[in-house]
Amino acid sequence: MIKIKKGLDLPIAGAPVQTIQDGPAIHHVALLGEEYVGMRPSMLVQEGDQVKKGQALFEDKKNPGVLFTAPASGKISAINRGERRVLQSVVIEVEGDEQIPFEHYAAEELNQLSDEQVQHHLLTSGLWTALRTRPFSKTPVPGSRPRAIFISAMDTQPLAADPQVIIATESEAFNHGLTVLTRLTDGKVHVCHAAGQAVTRHTNTQVTYNEFSGPHPAGLVGTHIHFLEPVSQTKMVWHVGYQDVIAIGKLFTRGELCTDRIVALAGPQVNQPILLRTRLGASLSELTAGKLKEGDNRIISGSVLSGTAFSATHGYLGRFHQQVSVIREGREKELFGWVMPGRDKYSITRTTLGHFFKRKLFAFSTDMHGGERAMVPIGNYERVMPLDILATHLLRDLLAGDTDSAQALGCLELDEEDLALCTFVCPGKYEYGPVLRDILTQIEQEG
């Protein structure tokens, strides 16, 4: 077992009850282009076209053969583009349940499949896009092979669902998915889970189980990779979400593309935080209708630490998100708030009275409690960074744009979510995730 000591479990109110309910009917779904790092689409459909679930919507020009398929059948109601014609979202108005059939196999045949067969099946169905590389967090190049594949069967994000509750409903499909993944690598398939949890073991010795304990980010895949298979420019691993492993298992044994998604709808502004069964790319406004408290709320696809805020073109459940978080917009001003004791304010540096109430849960809002200022190294970053990385030095070099030093300090091991806690505790109010992405892009382009 690997025990994480540094980190932070955010004491936020509104944790979900770990019970699964059917969500409301979803009439609009979308595939979000900006979730795929470096992707340039070659469109195969246009507005007004009728599509079936599993039908290809566009192909990646930079990664020929990588298809992005429809998560539902219906009509293409909108193709939204941003600056420089960057694809933001392809919106589908759901109609019917027609789907593209795929070849399927008996469970005992999965171990005999070649890697070419597995890759072809994943590419044509669109499930190849569920895989991501580390470093760079990109969709893998077809034909490549990773040193290892990681599945995080635990989640320490604030307000997250318990993955074991979800996996237990589809344990057979999950194990079939693991079998398929072993055909894609000569190394290990790492399943990382919380310490003390009873996990059904796969019979294939290529699948290994690793226990992690401790505060967030103990459940992040970046933490698991750092301790088990550290990456570099010459060593690449892949990772995939546990619900996508279930979808892979169903694809190969049933011949159908599963786009079901169980998400945690939670946060201080949710009336009854719970787990909802919905579909990939679901409209967040439809998913949360009638379930939120009155007021000016911010709906977030993903975690409050690293998710994507609701907007007109991005108001849909993200491809890699397992939760929908709702907090209050912090628009109000507080007179002399900086001199008040702050019983209802959380602080990691003991500057408010709320720090001394260890079991208190706080109704966090979007208020930053101050504006941007100089980066102040007072030890906050080291408190929440469990990786063997000099956090302050790395963040300083990221802000300075020093790619050589940032690479030497370990930035290739990181993704935006790995620096989310550093952003949260930063006295200077810096957003380190976008800065890291710019540096990673520059490193990749420079080779």
Swiss-Prot record:
GO terms for molecular function: oxidoreductase activity, acting on NAD(P)H, quinone or similar compound as acceptor. It comes from the Bacteria. GO terms for biological process: sodium ion transport. Keywords: Ion transport, NAD, Sodium, Sodium transport, Translocase, Transport, Ubiquinone. It catalyses: a ubiquinone + n Na(+)(in) + NADH + H(+) = a ubiquinol + n Na(+)(out) + NAD(+). It holds the Pfam family NQRA_2nd. It is an enzyme of class 7 (translocase). Its EC number is 7.2.1.1. Belongs to the NqrA family. NQR complex catalyzes the reduction of ubiquinone-1 to ubiquinol by two successive reactions, coupled with the transport of Na(+) ions from the cytoplasm to the periplasm. NqrA to NqrE are probably involved in the second step, the conversion of ubisemiquinone to ubiquinol. Composed of six subunits; NqrA, NqrB, NqrC, NqrD, NqrE and NqrF. This is Na(+)-translocating NADH-quinone reductase subunit A.
